């Protein structure tokens, strides 16, 4: 049952084939069995079981709240949750229990979703590996898959070369990929939903900026942050988006638009599409396997009658530097609120107020967070402001114009890689510092955040090592439904294989109703 889609399970709940409590208990059991992944910081077992009980009563009375009623979900631990600790994977917020729910969390609960827990991340979502939080790194479920073990010839007992999930929403990605929930909330500032989705073989969606409320999402970069959605298929993403989208009076950046439909069409006429391939994204660091799959995907669209053209986003080469300046500047501003006085950690140093401030931030933040604060403060210094921050804002405007020009030329959707490579082993990943890693991992994703566009990473095939590779589709602003419609068609063509988790496959009834795997249409050349 847990291997089915959200829509299928919703139908099963309505038909009485399974109860919300049974579903909840199965997910909780799987969370315990996969504890080694470190996907969850907090498991809200009592809360979820109580919610399941209430959902069960509604189903018995024929008063289901909708497709999400009784569906287990998880939430990244940088969204506020009433009565449940919200830490941002930081010592600064250990023990902090918010008095309110983030708008997106409340919307899920209002539709009857079951909150399984809060998922792991990089501290304050500053990272691309989900390795820098105080609760330890998240492990990629594909490390323990039959596909990876067989193709890479890894000894089943060798646990030293485990793989990262990507980040910073790695806990949410691992939770969905390991079947412990049907959907999870992530956040996306420069690729933090799409990156781990690509590495974990699931769908990661970043909505248009302003379509989904940010209220209750602990801010990193206000002008780029958006809540992200992680699911195992595009249709499930559309269902969740239909619940989350819409104006929120508590977030002035949300648009006054009707909520997006809760589903996308099953079929579409691809021949009417124009697909753009940005030439600047063909970088030397791109692995040959990802490059090959990108080319095959373009050929797939073309073979179905779509017009596929090369396009130019000329200011792409400046985007990473521009993103770094703007990101750290806003981080420095946002992190100023954590001073040890109002909430969160407070140092015991009491020599002076200044000494207490300094000690609190030294003890509460890790090196990565402190480093970004220092960088941001440097860019915002009076003597540097014009040369760095203002210039970066001007470059951002040019990057936005690049996308506008491409879409106004007739392009419907852009097709790009999501990441440079497949997931890498943790020991290899930590050889480089956080800033270098983030610059590499965000290369194809951060410009979308600066432009406020919708984007989705769709898993397309397994690498020669048996690991997932995802490709990214980028749409026009507020054309999220069209983007997901294209993504759903694309997903159907590539038929990405189901993960076979060793140790869980013995209990096939819990996860997969049949053990047959569909074969991927896109294969390595």
Swiss-Prot record:
Designated name of the protein: Glutamyl-tRNA(Gln) amidotransferase subunit A, mitochondrial
This protein's encoding gene: Qrsl1
Source organism, top-level taxon: Eukaryota
Upper lineage: Eukaryota, Metazoa, Chordata, Craniata, Vertebrata
Keyword presence, Protein biosynthesis: yes
Similarity comment: family membership: Belongs to the amidase family. GatA subfamily.
Bilayer-spanning residue ranges: none
Database matches in HAMAP family: GatA
Enzyme active site: 76 (charge relay system), 168 (charge relay system), 192 (acyl-ester intermediate)
């Amino acid at each position: 049952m847990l291997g089915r889609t959200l829509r299928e399970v919703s139908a099963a709940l309505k038909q009485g084939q399974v109860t919300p409590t049974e579903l909840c208990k199965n997910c909780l059991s799987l969370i315990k069995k996969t504890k080694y992944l470190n996907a969850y910081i907090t498991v809200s077992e009592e809360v979820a079981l109580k919610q399941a009980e209430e959902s069960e009563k509604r189903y018995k009375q024929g008063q289901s709240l909708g497709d999400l009623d009784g569906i287990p979900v998880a939430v990244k631990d940088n969204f506020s949750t009433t009565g449940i600790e919200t830490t941002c994977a930081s010592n600064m917020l250990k023990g902090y229990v918010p008095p309110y729910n983030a708008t997106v969390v409340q919307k899920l609960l209002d539709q009857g979703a079951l909150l399984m827990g809060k998922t792991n991340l990089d501290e304050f979502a500053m990272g691309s590996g989900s390795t820098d939080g105080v609760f330890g790194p998240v492990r990629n479920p594909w490390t323990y898959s039959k596909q990876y073990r067989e193709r890479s010839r890894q000894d089943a007992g060798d646990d030293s070369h485990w793989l990262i999930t990507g980040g910073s929403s790695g806990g949410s990605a691992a939770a969905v990929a390991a079947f412990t929930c049907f959907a999870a909330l992530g956040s996306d500032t420069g690729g933090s939903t799409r990156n781990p989705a690509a590495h974990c073989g699931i769908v990661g969606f970043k909505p248009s900026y302003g379509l989904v409320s940010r209220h209750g999402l602990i801010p990193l970069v206000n002008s780029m942050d958006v809540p992200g959605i992680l699911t195992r298929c595009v249709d499930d993403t559309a269902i969740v988006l239909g619940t989350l989208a819409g104006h929120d009076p508590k977030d002035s950046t949300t648009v006054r638009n009707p909520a997006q439909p809760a589903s996308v069409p099953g079929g579409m006429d691809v021949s009417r599409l124009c697909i753009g391939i940005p030439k600047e994204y063909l970088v030397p660091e791109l692995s040959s396997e990802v490059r090959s799959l990108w080319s095959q995907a373009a050929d797939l669209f073309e073979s179905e009658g779509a017009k596929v053209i090369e396009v130019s986003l000329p200011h792409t080469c400046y985007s990473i530097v521009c993103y770094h300046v703007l990101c750290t500047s806003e981080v420095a501003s946002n992190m100023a609120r954590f001073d040890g006085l109002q909430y969160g950690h407070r140092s015991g140093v009491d020599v002076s107020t200044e000494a207490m401030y300094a000690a609190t931030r030294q003890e509460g933040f890790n090196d990565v967070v402190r480093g970004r604060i220092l960088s941001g403060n440097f860019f915002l210094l009076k003597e540097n402001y014009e040369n760095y921050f203002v210039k970066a804002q001007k470059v951002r405007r040019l990057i936005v114009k690049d996308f506008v020009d491409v879409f106004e030329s007739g392009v419907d959707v852009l097709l790009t890689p999501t990441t440079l490579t497949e997931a890498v082993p943790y020991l290899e990943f930590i050889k480089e510092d956080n800033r270098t890693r983030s610059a590499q991992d965000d290369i194809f994703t951060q410009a979308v955040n600066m432009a406020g566009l919708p984007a989705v990473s769709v898993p397309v095939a397994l690498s020669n090592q048996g690991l997932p590779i995802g490709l990214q589709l980028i749409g026009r602003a507020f054309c999220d439904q069209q983007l997901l419609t294209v993504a759903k068609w694309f997903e159907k063509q590539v038929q990405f294989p189901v993960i076979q988790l060793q140790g869980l496959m013995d209990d096939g009834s819990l996860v997969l109703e049949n053990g047959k795997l569909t074969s991927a249409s896109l294969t390595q050349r």
